[in-house]
Amino acid sequence: MAVYEILKMGDPVLREKAKPVTRFNSNLGRLIDDMFDTMAAARGVGLAAPQIGIGKRVCVVEVGKRRFELVNPEIIEAEGEQCDAEGCLSIPDYTGRVKRFQRVRVKAQDRKGETFIAEGTDLLAVAFQHEIDHLDGILFVDRVENDNPEE
């Protein structure tokens, strides 16, 4: 497996909307495996394909023992609210408070093209939302809450 270099904020690829995956083949499977390896090497909980320079709607998430490969994901249901510190592998050494949904349901496909529904709460919900944002060219810093409105 390969470990990719993770792009940093400022790289224009991170601001582009990723294209849907239409081919479900061994190349996609290798990409997903490499993304899990890259995420683990960087000690992250999620990674989106644009973060490694690939403009496809693919992301991986691992929270605790729950591991997800999400191809063409979309949030289909969301409720509640949480506001916690968030960070990003593409923006090292920076965290900020971000308001997110507390629970989300995500419709996605796996590496074989099979559709499934994943549900997450708390950190898992944050990870799903954060990675799907990457697929839309949105970075978490775009959503950081201003803790001091006087500034």
Swiss-Prot record:
Belongs to the polypeptide deformylase family. Fe cation binds at C88, H130, H134. It catalyses: N-terminal N-formyl-L-methionyl-[peptide] + H2O = N-terminal L-methionyl-[peptide] + formate. GO terms for molecular function: metal ion binding; peptide deformylase activity. Pfam families: Pep_deformylase. Binds 1 Fe(2+) ion. Removes the formyl group from the N-terminal Met of newly synthesized proteins. Requires at least a dipeptide for an efficient rate of reaction. N-terminal L-methionine is a prerequisite for activity but the enzyme has broad specificity at other positions. This is Peptide deformylase. It comes from Heliobacterium modesticaldum (strain ATCC 51547 / Ice1). The keyword Hydrolase applies. One of its GO terms (biological process) is co-translational protein modification. It is an enzyme of class 3 (hydrolase). Its cofactor is Fe(2+). Keywords: Hydrolase, Iron, Metal-binding, Protein biosynthesis. Its EC number is 3.5.1.88. It comes from the Bacteria. The active site is at E131. InterPro entries: Peptide_deformylase (IPR023635), Peptide_deformylase_sf (IPR036821). The gene is def.
